[in-house]
């Protein structure tokens, strides 16, 4: 199965979700993301930021990571975390990255996700990577 690349803030919500998947993963550092390079296909798991207006939905560290052409060339899909209290901007980082990188938006989950979210994502990633022929 392919690699998961993720960013998690100090809240560790995204980290806890990814850890529960039990899959191979690499974390985008909070600083120095421009020096963080991935050389294989990956699915990005990212939290959504913003106070409901949609601005700043993608964390700056993730933007820096994806601004590297090599990193961007290996992204195959995106999964986003969010907070449904923000209505239309729930999981907006996934929409933004999917559109800009032209990759599928595979799933969104709230905060740290539920056991059902973990099972769905794990099963979905198995199918996704099989279709990608990795």
Curated annotation (Swiss-Prot):
Pfam families assigned to the protein according to its UniProt record, in alphabetical order: Flavodoxin_NdrI
GO process annotations (BP): protein modification process
Domain of life: Bacteria
Molecular function as annotated in GO: FMN binding
Signal peptide: none
Similarity comment: family membership: Belongs to the NrdI family.
Function: Probably involved in ribonucleotide reductase function.
Protein name: Protein NrdI
Protein's organism: Rhizobium etli (strain ATCC 51251 / DSM 11541 / JCM 21823 / NBRC 15573 / CFN 42)
């Amino acid at each position: 199965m392919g690699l998961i690349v993720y960013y998690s803030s100090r809240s560790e919500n995204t980290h806890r979700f990814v850890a529960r998947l039990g899959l191979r993963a690499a974390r985008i550092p909070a600083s120095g993301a421009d020096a963080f390079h991935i050389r294989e296909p990956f699915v990005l798991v990212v939290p959504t930021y913003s106070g409901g207006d949609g601005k700043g939905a993608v964390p700056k560290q993730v933007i820096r990571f994806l601004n590297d052409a090599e990193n961007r060339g290996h992204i195959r899909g995106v999964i986003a975390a969010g907070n449904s209290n923000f209505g239309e901007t729930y999981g907006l980082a996934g929409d933004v990255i999917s559109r800009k990188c032209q990759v599928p938006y595979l799933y969104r989950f709230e905060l740290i996700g539920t056991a059902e979210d973990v099972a769905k994502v794990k099963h979905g990633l198995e199918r996704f990577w099989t279709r990608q022929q990795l």
